[in-house]
Amino acid sequence: MAAAAARVVLLPAARRRLWGFSESLLIRGAAGRSSYFGENRLRSTQAATQVVLNVPETRVTCLESGLRVASEDSGLSTCTVGLWIDAGSRYENEKNNGTAHFLEHMAFKGTKKRSQLDLELEIENMGAHLNAYTSREQTVYYAKAFSKDLPRAVEILADIIQNSTLGEAEIERERGVILREMQEVETNLQEVVFDYLHATAYQNTALGRTILGPTENIKSISRKDLVDYITTHYKGPRIVLAAAGGVSHDELLDLAKFHFGDSLCTHKGEIPALPPCKFTGSEIRVRDDKMPLAHLAIAVEAVGWAHPDTICLMVANTLIGNWDRSFGGGMNLSSKLAQLTCHGNLCHSFQSFNTSYTDTGLWGLYMVCEPSTVADMLHVVQKEWMRLCTSVTESEVARARNLLKTNMLLQLDGSTPICEDIGRQMLCYNRRIPIPELEARIDAVNAETIREVCTKYIYNRSPAIAAVGPIEQLPDFKQICSNMCWLRD
């Protein structure tokens, strides 16, 4: 139940489209060929188009309370159903930071109808799995079960978020569990670096706070804090009941009306708007020469989920790619940065990232280096960023587009990832974006678009930097900023 970022999901029918072309391109590409092989290709294209059209529809219904019910029926014998709530650590303040994550821990500790033991036995006897996670903007509770047990799964989820007892004894017990979890997180240097990155990039704002909250808050959060958070944020318009697998939308809708129809209240007036989180180019350095490797993240401000430039930044992120010493390929890797890194033995690993929130985001790279190669690796990274702004080629962009589409489809394999994709997209876009539409938007990105968008968000922009470990060789912040617009070899 550790804090996690929201994931994406898809389904078996989509796996048949790993080539990644849109319908229109497939049909247009086959048209005009009159040879025997051309006719065969045309028949194959028509069959492939039917596969695309047979992808199950995502049905969406909004109840009077504002609760959105969304589902995709793929006829499987299992299903995943969950509640996606527009409430995470960003909705907290300094005093109650950590409450959303604390609530996630309390979800399975008993309700007015079920003790913790009863809840665990019921889930086990169903052969189901019950889980939850918290991110900076969302809280999720979901269950994976047999399709025939969908009614019981929905009833249990409704019971958990509406009738949790939040007993004092359980609160004290979970307080200790969360403190131990915090100790585990502090040993994961990647999580530590990303928390530092948010803290410096969004300093003095809600996104700058951690999901778990500070130790003093964990020790002081009370039952009243938990109840107040539920009362304030668990409102109908901010909740999505999503399901995928062997689910009937009509049945799910009836279950939603029965279990949530009259109990979820709405906001008086408009849903409260999130205060903006201002990005600040800055740095955090935690030097520890006893550590064997330096861990560093550098990022510029990106855009929110619904921004038109999001897709282009996703392609740019794929262009940079990721690399680890365990990878093969060497100079034959598709990522130019991976080639340079491998050839120069500059780092142990690097991973590009594009983290989006409602109205802002972070686009950057995380790397793990030897102390002596930190400066050289950062220099190569920034040089590659500048190349995206000036001279990226069409062949590179085409390869990145195909890789992005493939990865996108591979992540949507099974009812759980599909359900997560539905829930997340309903909160972010208030709709499920069809795969052909998403592929068409990716295919619209070319080298010129990459250069324009990267110049807009990367060139001459002040980055946020978080570095931990033996970082004596890391250039000063002024030098790093100057390399965002001009580099001397």
From Swiss-Prot:
The active site is at 104 (proton acceptor). Pfam families: Peptidase_M16, Peptidase_M16_C. Its cofactor is Zn(2+). It is an enzyme of class 3 (hydrolase). Zn(2+) binds at residues 101, 105, 181. PROSITE patterns: INSULINASE. GO terms for molecular function: metal ion binding; metalloendopeptidase activity. Gene3D superfamilies: Metalloenzyme, LuxS/M16 peptidase-like. Keywords: Hydrolase, Metal-binding, Metalloprotease, Mitochondrion, Protease, Transit peptide, Zinc. One of its GO terms (cellular component) is mitochondrial matrix. It is found in: Mitochondrion matrix. It catalyses: Release of N-terminal transit peptides from precursor proteins imported into the mitochondrion, typically with Arg in position P2. Binding to PMPCA is required for catalytic activity. The record marks 191, 195 as: Required for the specific determination of the substrate cleavage site. GO terms for biological process: protein processing involved in protein targeting to mitochondrion. Its EC number is 3.4.24.64. Residues 1-45 form a transit peptide. Its main location: mitochondrion. Binds 1 zinc ion per subunit. Belongs to the peptidase M16 family. Heterodimer of PMPCA (alpha) and PMPCB (beta) subunits, forming the mitochondrial processing protease (MPP) in which PMPCA is involved in substrate recognition and binding and PMPCB is the catalytic subunit. Catalytic subunit of the essential mitochondrial processing protease (MPP), which cleaves the mitochondrial sequence off newly imported precursors proteins. Preferentially, cleaves after an arginine at position P2. Required for PINK1 turnover by coupling PINK1 mitochondrial import and cleavage, which results in subsequent PINK1 proteolysis. This is Mitochondrial-processing peptidase subunit beta. It comes from Pongo abelii. The lineage of its organism: Eukaryota, Metazoa, Chordata, Craniata, Vertebrata. The gene is PMPCB.
